[in-house]
Curated annotation (Swiss-Prot):
It comes from the Bacteria. This is 4-hydroxy-tetrahydrodipicolinate synthase. It comes from Campylobacter curvus (strain 525.92). HAMAP family: DapA. The record marks T46, Y110 as: Part of a proton relay during catalysis.
Length: 297
């Protein structure tokens, strides 16, 4: 299966207005990403607060993303994860039937399945659809690690599982995956290590920072993929401070604050249990942003 889901990808935030999904702003944010050269948009992932969306809201976000990207070269990698396999399959089937180019499926959270359980979970999802599936490994959030042996097994046996978004924070893990399976598509899931992963064989990034600075992330990613490593590293170094401050509290708390400060969202709203950043961190975010040129709509 030819992989078209790589390069510079944005883990989209989900804007709210008076407690409800702000569909108009969400569409505008996606069109801003398209305008600034992003390759793939990723709605309803961790950054999109998928855990606190209703199933209907989740599906609406996918529809908006697909419609916004229609007649463009930008692809949609739809979040379709759940800790219940039957729910993940429902999201996956919806994404496929509504035109998504692939799905991002986070490891089941809270119930801590075994490696065999993870294998069966992902195999069932992959067999339920025909579009590409990107595994999503983020043990710090979900409580379970998709071990390399399980990744290789799934990659070998499921034709539409093409790679993994690695958010372990470990460059060594990514290098090990690629050393044992060079055809596996490894995507960086942490902005702090985008450059090291790209320069060691990674094929793209799913970036939180790209919500705010899509042009920077596009340039960094494309330069690295073209093996222009000196230029890519210079951009990566410039992004160091913003990448750091955007994770001063749990994602997506800081990035939504930054988007609000930049005037890209009109309301600073979260779904509980997420809440606004501390006043101290809000000021730090605001101060750090002054060092970057942030493009509007």
């Amino acid at each position: 299966m030819k992989n078209i889901l790589q390069g510079a990808m944005t883990a989209l935030i989900t804007p709210f207005k008076n407690g409800k999904l702000d569909e108009e702003t969400f569409e505008k944010l996606i069109k801003r990403q398209i305008k600034n050269g992003i390759d793939v948009v990723v709605p309803v992932g961790t950054t999109g607060e998928s855990a606190t969306l209703t199933h209907n809201e989740h599906k609406i976000c996918i529809e908006i993303a697909v419609n916004a990207c229609k007649d463009t070269n930008v692809k949609v990698l739809a979040g379709a994860g759940s800790n219940a396999t039957h729910e993940a399959i429902d999201f996956a089937k919806f994404a496929q039937s509504h035109g998504a180019d692939g799905i991002l499926s986070v490891a089941p959270y809270y119930n801590k399945p075994t490696q065999e359980g993870l294998y069966q979970h992902y195999k069932a999802i992959a067999e339920s659809i025909d579009i590409p599936v990107l595994l999503y490994n983020v043990p710090g959030r979900v409580g379970v690690d998709i071990l390399p042996s399980t990744v290789f097994r799934l990659f070998k046996e499921c034709k539409n599982i093409f790679g993994i978004k690695e958010a372990t924070g470990s460059i060594d893990r990514c290098v090990d995956l690629l050393a044992h399976e060079p055809n596996l598509v490894v995507i960086s899931g942490e902005d702090a290590i985008n450059y090291p992963i790209l320069s060691n064989g990674g094929k793209g990034v799913i970036s939180v920072t790209a919500n705010l600075l899509p042009d920077y992330i596009c340039e960094l990613t494309h330069l690295a993929l073209d093996e222009e490593y000196t230029k890519a590293k210079a951009i990566n170094d410039k992004l160091y401070n913003i990448n750091k401050i955007l994770f001063c509290e749990s994602n997506p708390i800081p990035i939504k604050a930054a988007m609000y400060i930049a005037g890209l969202i009109g309301n600073l709203e979260y779904r509980l249990p997420l809440c606004e950043p501390s006043s101290e961190n809000f000021k730090k975010i605001e101060q750090t942003m002054k060092n970057y040129e942030i493009k509007g709509f």
